[in-house]
Amino acid sequence: MDANLRRKLDELPAEPGCYLMKDRAGEVVYVGKASSLRSRVRSYFDPGRGDQRAFVALLDELLGDLEVIVTRSEKEAVLLENELIKKHRPRFNVRLRDDKDFIVLKLDERHPYPRLEVRRAREKRQPGARYFGPYSSASSIRETLRMVNRHFQLRTCSDHVFDHRKRPCILYQIHRCPAPCVYEVAAEEYRQSVEDAVEFLEGREGELVERLRGRMAGAAEGLRFEEAARLRDQLQAVERSLEKQRVLMSDRGDRDVIGLYREGPDLVVQVLSMRAGKLQDAQAHPFREQEFPDEEILSSFLSLYYEHTDAPDEILVPLEPVQAEALADVLSERRGRRVRLLTPQRGAKADLLDVARRNAEQGFRAWHEHDERREQALAAVARALHLARPPRWMECYDISTFQGALAVGSGVSMKDGEPDKANYRRYKVKAVAGQDDFAMLHEVITRRLRRALGEGQLPDLIVIDGGKGQLNAALAAAKDLGVPTRPSPGNPDAPFVELVGLAKSRLVDGPSLGTARVVGRRGRRAEARLADAAEAAEKGFVSELARSPERVFLPGRKDPVVLRQNSAELFLLARLRDEAHRFAITFHRKLRRERNFQSVLEEIPGIGEGRKRALLRHFGALRRVREATPEEIAQVEGFGPRQAAAVHAFFHRPDAPPIAADEPSGAPAGAPGGGPAEASPEAVAAATEAEIDAALADEDASPEPAA
């Protein structure tokens, strides 16, 4: 340890605060908090604490500087640590998934007919609204929302649609919604359905079951058989839900149980959420390179996790976290009620901690097995494509254009086989006019590689969505910039990026390479080589679907590599390519709508660029602007009664421009004369959303000639 660090250790104050450990490059690698900065930080370098020697040795190697921030209280230190971790994202701190990944259900009880909405947990909580969650996955929240809306018949339409609908939607016809948007539905009756749904979401099904039984019996006695049947269906749905839930505690309390399992620097924190004594959800949170003590890791985790999640009455933890009392005060303040952190040593609650620990161990095993499969898939990609190394950092690029208009490019990133959305990029093609996919791709790859050279970081592999022509355009861009696409024999450590082209499978006409799904006379299915399709037909098999295989084009090779069907390497590359395609089409659709929106609003006198953007942000679609009242338009930023009246009058004059409906119609628009011509802005504006989306999606409607 150098003299500067030793001096800082000697001068540490015995006060609460946070400390930032930095490496020799000045990057923050760990943030911690302490009730006494002197005691906590010096403990890392105390030779008498043998249980911490592994990470102390690591500190001796990495630590270059130390910074401390003194706070007025321990509670303030807890809050500051949370903010510092989010700001610096240190290597050795626990970091949860981005908070935009956490999803909750929101119920705005200020509305006379509220609905359940899916919201990001990071959104600011609104007064008068109730929140349920967070949910561990999008599928779980969709299933919950589907069940609640189906059996408790809450409306699903947005407030804007609710205010402007003139006739009921299909959900009313199939008895899934009472249509309060159109018909007079008693607010008290709807409120009863809302309260039933709230009890179900909060895990108080026992009370709900008793009340539903009483109301069902009352409806039957009053000869209201249709109402009784509806209540019976609700009761059966709730009882089925109860059968799936495991009762772990008889006291019907709300608590979270935290389990922790570690092997070396890797660990998993398991959260078992119990509501009304029943297990409601289970989430496993894996973390790498966690060299610091478990009590510090647990404290940071709880502070971060409950920032966007309502803490229950009790949180059972396997060991006492650092500054447990201050942490409990922070969680209680966030919740508005008391939250207790307990570490039971015996009894039923201690048994729950053991269950959580065993679940954490199981989650750890599953996590590492997933890592092994991912490593095998990356190695398989390297072998199949003759790459110099496993592609840990892959990117894929795609071009999206409608007859040469509004051309855009997309780039998606994948690191270690997982999406890396922080490095997703969108490109507006600037230097190419007309329908020239190769030139567009050359421009996009040039801009990407130029930025990579400036940052000093090249991906391992760039996948081009397309065939040999698209790959050659990308290779030309790399050559123009002097970017190596193969390792240098004389300097194996020199940076380089490899490029390949991935061509989609297509429908084929007649015998060709690849496989076909064939069906026999007795319904038996089998994979057959397309070259043997005629023989298969003679034997009584009929081709169900014939497609060419996915083909990967490599630099300097005439024939493409055909990847094995259903292989891990094909799945990984196709997933990357499809994500790039989705990202490009989404961006193209956004630009299209903005352009159509702007072109129509340009005809309204007195509406400048700022007000156009405000209308677009507020309403999102021209149809919604047309349906809005002058009072609703006046609520948009920058609009007063005069501007709102002008917009409303423009859309309701006798010669108002037609506004395409959101519903898809028509077929893909084609260009006359065989080849696609560049579309004018007017043509793009006139085409329906469905027509353009279908053209961009490239659904392979026409067969590919036989090879």
Curated annotation (Swiss-Prot):
One of its GO terms (molecular function) is excinuclease ABC activity. Residues 660-670, 677-689 have a biased composition (Low complexity). Residues 655-707 are annotated as: Disordered. Residues 206-241 form the UVR domain. Belongs to the UvrC family. GO terms for cellular component: cytoplasm; excinuclease repair complex. It comes from the Bacteria. It is found in: Cytoplasm. NCBIfam families: uvrC. The lineage of its organism: Bacteria, Pseudomonadati, Myxococcota, Myxococcia, Myxococcales. Residues 690-707 have a biased composition (Acidic residues). Keywords: Cytoplasm, DNA damage, DNA excision, DNA repair, Excision nuclease, SOS response. Interacts with UvrB in an incision complex. Residues 14-94 form the GIY-YIG domain. GO terms for biological process: nucleotide-excision repair; SOS response. This is UvrABC system protein C. InterPro entries: DisA/LigA_HHH (IPR041663), GIY-YIG_endonuc (IPR000305), GIY-YIG_endonuc_sf (IPR035901), GIY-YIG_UvrC_Cho (IPR047296), Hlx-hairpin-Hlx_DNA-bd_motif (IPR003583), RuvA_2-like (IPR010994), UVR_dom (IPR001943), UVR_dom_sf (IPR036876). The UvrABC repair system catalyzes the recognition and processing of DNA lesions. UvrC both incises the 5' and 3' sides of the lesion. The N-terminal half is responsible for the 3' incision and the C-terminal half is responsible for the 5' incision. Pfam families: GIY-YIG, HHH_2, UVR, UvrC_RNaseH, UvrC_RNaseH_dom. It comes from Anaeromyxobacter dehalogenans (strain 2CP-1 / ATCC BAA-258).
